[in-house]
């Protein structure tokens, strides 16, 4: 899962699918979704799948490539866009020769960015090209600062993963799941919240960081209100 951490250089909030990856030399192009690199975009309820279509020479109708196409309309070069601050899946076919170095470029705003989160799963990312600590805390000799004030932004805190906001980060083979833990007053051991904790080690405030360039799932429990997460810019004046 990768992130759209830059704005287009013209200052707009959306980037064309065709322009998302500037260096296309490492992309795998094919004539089906299964043989091509894919970009998968979540809209809150379903994925839209795009694949990098090669030029098909046996039918003039399909002399459109290589370019990105919607898997449901593969004869037409897509004009769809993705919003800055989103996360997307980038999927490679199993036959791909090697890892690709994906480069996304643009401008960095000095203004804060607002992430809208709804009940259910939201695919988002840091809106800026920097690491994003989940908690502000001291780690050894380093003070790491989270760019989001979770309390003022209304993050949903609970004492189980199912009753709390979650952040789920994919490492290439599995998800690391974190949830926003509330203060638990019945046991002094757990007077740690509200803060983000690893679901596998929920008694300890996590030093976890979402790496620059990586998207993630932000899951809000059903029945809770939608909200806005305000992320500070690293170059704010």
Give residue spans per PLM region:
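Fold-core signature of tandem repeat domains
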Residues: 39-41, 50, 90, 167-170, ...
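Ser/Thr/Pro-rich low-complexity tandem-repeat tracts
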Residues: 25, 35-36, 45-48, 164, ...
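A short, polar beta-strand/turn micro-motif
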Residues: 1-35, 43, 79-158, 208-237
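Intrinsically disordered, low-complexity segments enriched in Gly and acidic/Ser/Thr residues
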Residues: 127, 131-201
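A cross-kingdom feature marking solvent-exposed beta-strand/loop segments within repeated
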Residues: 46-84, 174-212
